[in-house]
Curated annotation (Swiss-Prot):
Name of the coding gene: bglap
Binding site for Ca(2+) 3: 76, 82
Disulphide-bridged cysteine pairs: 75-81
Posttranslational mods: Gamma-carboxyglutamate residues are formed by vitamin K dependent carboxylation by GGCX. These residues are essential for the binding of calcium.
GO biological process: biomineral tissue development; bone development; cellular response to insulin stimulus; glucose homeostasis; negative regulation of bone development; osteoblast differentiation; regulation of bone mineralization; regulation of cellular response to insulin stimulus
Function according to Swiss-Prot or TrEMBL: The carboxylated form is one of the main organic components of the bone matrix, which constitutes 1-2% of the total bone protein. The carboxylated form binds strongly to apatite and calcium.
Protein name, entry field: Osteocalcin
Record keywords: Biomineralization, Calcium, Cleavage on pair of basic residues, Disulfide bond, Gamma-carboxyglutamic acid, Hormone, Metal-binding, Secreted, Signal
Annotated positions of the 4-carboxyglutamate modification: 69, 73, 76
MF-aspect GO terms: calcium ion binding; hormone activity; hydroxyapatite binding; structural constituent of bone
Places the protein is found: Secreted
The Gla domain, residue ranges: 53-99
Transmembrane segments: none
Length: 101
């Protein structure tokens, strides 16, 4: 028990000593650590390059993987078809609403 109390007191003293070092520093703008958080635009651009795509797929969505996927998306947009798809499956619901494909 005495060892635990002694350990806690020792750690508390260490925290007080280390904490008082930071309190001695001035918080002026020139010495502030927050000024180190900002870098110039040129420096930020040197490591944060964006991938650019020029005109190939502008305005187009991603290609649909399979015909079933496009049918599923059409069925999901119709609330009645979507509800029926929950009960009997989307292929059968799509067939009932939009006919055989």
């Amino acid at each position: 028990m005495k060892l635990a109390i002694l350990t806690v007191l020792l750690l508390g003293a260490a925290v007080l000593c280390l904490g008082s070092k930071d309190a001695d520093h001035s918080n002026s703008v020139g010495e502030s650590h927050s000024s180190e958080a900002f870098i110039s635009r040129q420096e930020s651009a040197s490591f944060a390059r964006l991938k650019r795509s020029y005109g190939n797929n502008v305005g187009q969505g991603a290609a649909v993987g399979s015909p079933l996927e496009s049918q599923r998306e059409v069925c999901e947009l119709n609330p009645d078809c979507d509800e029926l798809a929950d009960h009997i499956g989307f292929q059968e619901a799509y067939r009932r609403f939009y006919g055989p494909v």
